Design a protein with these regions (language model features):
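FNR/FR-type flavoprotein reductase catalytic core
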Residues: 75-212
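Local cysteine-cluster metal-coordination motifs and their immediate loop/turn environment
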Residues: 119, 210-239
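Ferredoxin-reductase
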Residues: 2-87
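Short, Lys/Arg- and Gly-enriched loop/turn segments at beta-strand edges
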Residues: 51-58, 96-103, 235
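Short microdomains enriched in Cys/His and/or Lys/Arg
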Residues: 239-250
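Structural signal for conserved beta-strand scaffold positions within catalytic alpha/beta enzyme cores
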Residues: 16, 60, 161-163, 207-209, ...
């Protein structure tokens, strides 16, 4: 089971903030990461001049260092992409439940689409450290959007990249590259991709959802998702849900 979640508020200093593609950036920050306990959790970033914090998935972390990979989709993330080294940021860390590594089995499969790829990196790192044979499928629209392939390969993962237009790797969607056998799967990406993975897989697995959030810690109910046991808050009971509890909205 994922470890108990302990949210913390801390100041972090930007060590690196560089583009990986045209609109995807990698930000490395230094600060207190002790509130992060599970792969698949997220942070909430306070930006000057913006009322709502920005939720960003954790790509990787260790003692004193945090890596985020984010996409520029609006004014807030645009402002983030322009922040220089040395900038201090107010973060809520250790948000969300994270993935359950105990269910992985010997040969887990990780499936990421677009900016759903980053939270799978720390998961892969931990699974490899446990001696698992990890396979990864990374899905993008086109070659120019591909990132993180080499990072997963350096961990020792078997990696397949798919592009919708066929300009790089396997042509098609992540579901076109599913292997015949694997022990368990973990997936994160846009909701249409998650639904396609749900319908294409027979094994058990976990889904990490991306939703717009208000508070980020369960107070506002703005990111609720329907499940077999009622509505769950993506920011609190999620963002990771097990396959068998998901009810897709028609």
């Amino acid at each position: 089971m994922p470890k108990e979640v302990t949210m913390k508020r801390s100041l972090f200093e930007i060590e690196k903030n560089i583009p990986l593609t045209k609109d995807v950036f990698e930000m490395v920050l230094n600060g207190d990461t002790s509130g992060i306990t599970n792969a698949g959790q997220f942070v909430n970033i306070l930006l000057d001049g913006y009322y709502l914090r920005r939720p960003i998935s954790v790509c990787d972390y260790d003692e004193g260092s945090l890596t985020l990979i984010y996409k520029v989709v609006g004014k807030g993330t645009k402002a983030m992409s322009e922040m220089p080294v040395g900038t201090n940021l107010d973060l809520l860390v250790g948000l969300g439940n994270g993935y359950d590594l105990s269910r992985a089995g010997d040969h887990p499969l990780l499936i990421g689409g677009g900016v759903g790829v980053p939270p799978l990196y720390n998961l892969a790192k931990k699974l490899v450290k446990e001696g698992k044979k990890v396979s990864v499928i990374l899905g993008f629209n086109k070659k120019e959007e591909v990132f993180a392939e080499d990072s997963f390969k350096k961990l020792g993962c078997d990696v397949i990249v798919t592009t919708v237009d066929g300009s790089y790797g396997t042509k098609g969607f992540v579901t076109n590259a599913l292997p015949e056998s694997y022990s368990y799967f973990y997936t994160c990406g846009p909701e249409p991709m998650l639904k396609a993975v749900y319908n294409a897989t027979t094994a058990e697995g976990e889904f990490s959802f991306e939703r717009r959030m208000g508070c980020g810690f369960g107070a506002c109910m703005g990111c609720s998702c329907k499940t077999i046991t009622g509505y769950k808050r993506i920011c609190k009971e999620g963002p990771v849900l097990r396959k068998e509890e998901i009810l897709w909205e028609k």
